[in-house]
Amino acid sequence: MNEKRTSIFENGLIWFGAGVSLAEILTGTYFAPLGFGKGVLAIIIGHIIGCMMLFLAGVIGGKTRQSAMETVKMSFGEKGGVFFSFLNVLQLVGWTAIMIYDGALAANGVLHTGRWVWCLVIGALIILWIVIGITNLGKINTVAMAALFILTLVLSRVIFGDGSVAGAGGDAMTFGAAVELSVAMPLSWLPLISDYTREAKEPVKATAVSAVVYGVVSCWMYVIGMNAAIYTGESDIANIMVKAGLGIAGLLIIVFSTVTTTFLDAYSAGISSESVFSKINGKYAAIVVTVIGMIGAIVYPMDNITDFLYLIGSVFAPMIAIQIADFFILKRKDSLEVSLDVMNGVIWVIGFILYRLLMNVDIPLGNTLPDMVITIVICILARKCIKTEK
């Protein structure tokens, strides 16, 4: 019996849903002080860098038919894989809570029924998506994405309707910091993408489509957020929707975009949990993560996510850099045979520290790219030195 696989189109839909996100729109509002021209340039450069890494990460999982965190074991060993799986579950629980919080806050700003009510509604819809399952979402996802696409076109028409764009509004953010904030969003998906590309009929093509679709749509959301902040003078999503006169249409954008994006976070948290605890059922774990996210969203305020994004970058940028070096350049999978690959662990620590140090330096292309390049070079040189000694 043939195992059910996802098509290129289905993978594109999944990542369209990931890109249409309140988190992207909200992050885009931070770019307003740069002005439209510089802001768009920073968004595009950052997404090109981030989505190239996203593609390479997805190819590794697609070719090996392994989940994202299982592929990590090829470079870091069994215990190393468990370590990153644990960190990934933590960041995904965080993302789930943040997304539900943002969605509920924005929905409540449009239709005042209580934030906690919207937390429950959005959480219940995410659980429904999980129960249906990634390989059975085809028609439902097509309808949801079509509706979402139309609604975001309406939002774009309202935001850009007069054809005018604004100039710089201040110097609150450097260009390099803006690029890094643009890289950070696709980078946050690095530990997830293989969970979906491993299910694809044509993994490399599906990964390419996933990265391109996500990159284009995410850029679109960033630009909407940036120009909405300029257009309305607001950085609050609900106020932007209300001032734009979107009403119920805005509410639907908020709810559906939150569900389709957060589903990916919760689902991948479940898959990663299987790497930490082998007896856990991924689907049930994903439901538990959603419930925890709902509770967190109800109890805790989560208004600024920039530090959270940078923390994700500092953890996962050097991790994927080592994986890229091992899989594509060194062609090695030796770490599967060991409990912990100490050398790659040390190189990751160096990459992590380097990322945090580079955050204090204003680099036009952001700090992710130089951090990853240096980490890859260190990884290659270290392996070459070992071979020479042998």
Task: Give the location of each predicted region.
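Extracellular loop-to-transmembrane helix junctions
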Residues: T29-V59, G80, Y214, P370, ...
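Hydrophobic transmembrane alpha-helices that form the core helical bundles
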Residues: G80-T113, V259-S275
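Transmembrane alpha-helical segments of multi-pass small-molecule transport proteins
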Residues: I14-A18, F84-V89, V110-I132, M145-S156, ...
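Membrane-water interface regions at transmembrane-helix termini and the short interhelical loops
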Residues: T29-P33, V59, D102-V110, G123-A144, ...
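C-terminal membrane-solvent junction of multi-pass transporters and transport-like membrane proteins
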Residues: G170, A321-K390
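Membrane-interface "cap" regions at the ends of multi-pass membrane proteins
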Residues: M1-K38, N136, T174-V179, P191, ...
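Juxtamembrane transmembrane-helix boundary signature
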Residues: I44-F76, F83-V89, R383-T388
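Membrane-interface loop-to-helix entry segments
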Residues: V117-I159, G169-G170, T207-Y214, L309-A321, ...
